[in-house]
A protein has these predicted regions:
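HTH-adjacent hinge/linker in prokaryotic transcriptional regulators
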Residues: 42-59
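Extreme N-terminal segment that seeds HTH/winged-HTH DNA-binding domains in transcriptional regulators
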Residues: 1-30
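Key DNA-contact positions within bacterial/archaeal DNA-binding proteins
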Residues: 35
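Intrinsically disordered, low-complexity sequence elements enriched in Ser/Thr/Gly/Pro
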Residues: 4-5, 32, 43, 54
């Protein structure tokens, strides 16, 4: 899975989630480091209004 595909999947997961999703959980699910997820989320949040970062995860 390339970066763009991973980011699209993350966005899909967040849009369908009922609760905040932790970066640690996303990292495990996609087989990447938490830092990669943090970087992905910075790009996703810049391009997608309404995505928030909380102490419990992303919503």
């Amino acid at each position: 899975m390339n970066t763009a595909e991973r980011r699209n999947e993350i966005l899909n997961l967040l849009q369908n989630a009922d609760a905040p999703v932790a970066a640690r959980k996303l990292a495990s699910q996609f087989g990447v480091s938490r830092q990669v997820i943090v970087q992905d989320m910075a790009v996703i949040r810049a391009a997608t209004p309404g995505i928030l970062s909380t102490t419990r995860g992303y919503v």
